[in-house]
C-alpha cells in the first residue's frame, strides 16, 4: 500500500502529518505536484513533479496508483476516479471517500458548481483548524493500521 498526495492544493499542515506518519509507519508517501516543493529527507517520502496543466497531477496519480492505495485529495472527481480504480481517497479534513458515499458527494459538488455558474455566491471552505487536523490524523492512522503491512 502506498499513499499518493495531490500535493499542489494540499495544506502544509496536512503534509507535515503525512511526513511524520510516513517515517513512523514506514509507509511510502509520494507527493505529486506540478512544481518542486521541499520534502524532508526520508526513504519513505518522494516527490513526483509533473508538467503544468489542467488535471495533469490528477491523471498521473490515477495512472500510478494500485488497488488498495490511498490518495489524499480534496478533489472530488479525482477521488471518484481513485475509488473506481480500487483505491481509497481521504480529504484533508478527515473524510474518507468510499464507494458508498462518493456518488452523492460528487452530485453535491456538481450541484454547487452549477449554482456558482449561475451567479450564486457559495463561498469556499473554511481554513483547516485543529479539529480538522485531528480528524485527518485519526482517519489516516485508522486506515494505515488496517491496511498497511510493513515489509
Swiss-Prot record:
It holds the Pfam family DUF188. InterPro entries: UPF0178 (IPR003791). Disulfide bonds: none annotated. NCBIfam families: PRK00124.1. Belongs to the UPF0178 family. HAMAP family: UPF0178. This is UPF0178 protein Spea_2958. It comes from Shewanella pealeana (strain ATCC 700345 / ANG-SQ1).
